[in-house]
Amino acid sequence: MSPQWLAYSKDSPPESITKPMQKLVEVLADKQALIEKSLALVLEKITTSLDQQDYVTIALSGGSTPKPLYEALSSQPLDWSKIHVFWGDERYVSPDHPDSNQRMARLAWLDRIPIPAANIHPMPTDDPDPQLAAQKYDDHLRQWFGVNSPDFPVFDLILLGMGDDGHTASLFPQTAALTVSDRCITVGEKDGNPRLTFTVPLINQARCVIFIAAGESKRPALHEIFSAHGDSFSYPSRLIHPSAGELYWLLDAAAGSSFV
């Protein structure tokens, strides 16, 4: 199967889109092709950013799908001193916990490259109160980017996954986190367990957002997300539409064949 591109323009936006935007969807033959395309696109965005500025900022997703991408990135000959890594969400567990997104990225990628420790910006999960931890990371982002409220930091690249229920980061269906509009970081919840997560407005300030999704189980949610009449509160990934940036959806054939 050759890659297929679909363009969703301002003439056929989801209900949540209020500004003209083009969304690019590419369906790859299998998971290996998906990771290869993801790697090529991430490297392109890093290179382009470094051609225009002194450093690049990347926010990572968790889950199993991006792990091969992170492993592939670990062998790339990049100037890691110019790359700053953040996380788009994190389970509220210790950094060495098997479920930690930070741990997964470190083992697959960051511990295997000569990146300065100061360039790694994990979400804090050591405070007894997740709300205080969310505020700490919010403060860190604003201080590091030099941005005061009500403005939001602008990431060069945000990587996102999508769950079978249409959630992304830790923005779950029918939850209060979806409506937070004045903060960079909020507390999401899954099965009663707190998580830290980027907010919708922070994600939508990014210069580039790349969704990576695989598997037949994603099809029903993708149908609703790409529908002109889907419910964004039930399928939170619909809320992601960078106001002045690029949005890519990279899918394997199992997930995206019905969109070809």
Residue spans for each PLM region:
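Glycine-rich N-terminal segment of FAD-binding domains in flavoprotein oxidoreductases
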Residues: 50-75
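Ligand-binding beta-strand-loop-alpha-helix segment within the catalytic cores
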Residues: 81-156
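Glycine-rich beta-strand-to-loop/alpha-helix junction loops that act as flexible
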Residues: 60-65, 160-164, 214
